């Protein structure tokens, strides 16, 4: 299936619901009863490392996609019922306004910055989850820097410790009655390796994400989070500190009972006690069904965004000689093309590229996994070198995987065809490139024209960069 950005590029709420419904059935078949999804985060900072899990940066579209996703995952609009998988919408709230694009799994990315005073717009997509009666909410690790509600500044702590965000706004203003599940390890310490990165030769491990409350003890963090509104702690298997807090009269048993009731109610509503087992044979016949894969392939094709098609290069004609980069030769051969070993021998070149990124924080556990930094293709980028090489010799088709909004200025002027993708197989790509049907995918975020424009935009405001190369919602038909 197309990734969530691809579903946003399609823009069909019912398709998103269908996608989540299929996932629900596969999850249930193998015994998964809770999903840490969807992300309702608004991807307003184009450098952010976790855009690929979102539905983009248009508040209305994200709202609608989130609503459809939860209805599919929970088997309807009435909250948890038999056949539901518990959906956990995340990350409440403002996670996508990541300062400098750095993610708050890391100490160097613990802040989301609200210089545009735009928290209200980040809240709006979550109302789609509330309309679908979402079962659970996960707060963000991030400290919302410069953010305020009703003119009152937010306490500078991660959302899992914020009474304002969890009790006053989420439960009070929006009437959320479900489970608040913290993100993982928010009560753990961030030690020196977590703060400074590991020395050369040492393997990094996850540290704690107790942003804003680093001066508290782990037990004090548990108390503060529970008092803020947290019901359940992600990644915690030892409850002794909570027991100690009750025994020391820092928390009441009545308050813990409120959380226990919420958690148990979910288990009862989904039938987990009555029917905790799965049938392995049924699972084998459910997961990866051929008819579902056919639907998934169709969605992948619909999610492709045609950004440029010069000189009528598309659709590609079968039988042509083709030079490939990042594409399996067998897929091209099955599609009816003759694969050659140099652009000079080809009629056309097809290149699969990845949105550019940097990894300046490889000494951190999550930093070494995250795509950070510049969005621009540079001369030493291997994908860009392939584009330059091919475009000197032959009409070139480039498809760029847009896990972040790449700057395509120096790709657009070399390639005849440019296509944005959000996860597409080689087979589906060839089916689409040889089809005469119109493209229907639209960009779920804008593509900036330069890194200067990226640096000047406000991290909490959607699609606000100066003179974008491609505006949000852009997509050619042919």
Language-model segments: residues:
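Extracytoplasmic/secreted envelope proteins and their assembly/folding machinery
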Residues: 20, 24, 63-70, 123, ...
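Glycine-rich tight-turn/loop motif centered on a GG-T
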Residues: 2-13, 46-65, 101-120, 147-160, ...
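C-terminal non-catalytic regions of proteins with extracellular/luminal or membrane-system context
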Residues: 29, 186-190, 215-218, 240-253, ...
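Sec-exported extracytoplasmic/periplasmic mature domains
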Residues: 24-32, 70-78, 127-131, 171, ...
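Helix-enriched interaction subdomains in cytosolic or periplasmic regions
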Residues: 54, 246, 254-256, 260, ...
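Structural recognition of the beta-strand scaffold that forms the well-ordered cores
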Residues: 25-28, 33-38, 43, 85-89, ...
